[in-house]
UniProtKB/Swiss-Prot annotation:
GO terms for molecular function: small ribosomal subunit rRNA binding; structural constituent of ribosome. Residues 1-22 are annotated as: Disordered. The gene is rpsR2. The keyword RNA-binding applies. This is Small ribosomal subunit protein bS18B. NCBIfam families: S18. It comes from Streptomyces avermitilis (strain ATCC 31267 / DSM 46492 / JCM 5070 / NBRC 14893 / NCIMB 12804 / NRRL 8165 / MA-4680). Part of the 30S ribosomal subunit. Forms a tight heterodimer with protein bS6. Keywords: Ribonucleoprotein, Ribosomal protein, RNA-binding, rRNA-binding.
Length: 78
């Protein structure tokens, strides 16, 4: 029996939230922005979920880690 052809769904790429809002500098003191990239358990969300570039993901991770060190963000929320 011949296989059915696989249909690819053409989806528009989701926009980068940082570029869309014009954010160029990611600061560890901006906890409202950083919380958007954390899960409800306090973990940093992946690039695939947040749609940021690799460089922005590295800057976000560094800012979140600095904010945790300064006790602005929790390490985890249980």
């Amino acid at each position: 029996m011949p296989r059915k052809p696989v249909r690819k769904v053409a989806s528009t790429p989701r926009p980068n939230p940082l570029d869309q809002n014009g954010i160029t500098y990611i600061d560890y003191k901006d906890t409202d922005l950083l919380r958007k990239f954390l899960s409800d358990r306090g973990k940093i969300r992946s690039r695939r979920v947040t749609r940021v570039t690799a460089q922005q993901q590295r800057l976000l991770a560094r800012a979140v880690k600095n904010a945790r060190e300064m006790a602005l963000l929790p390490y985890s929320s249980r």
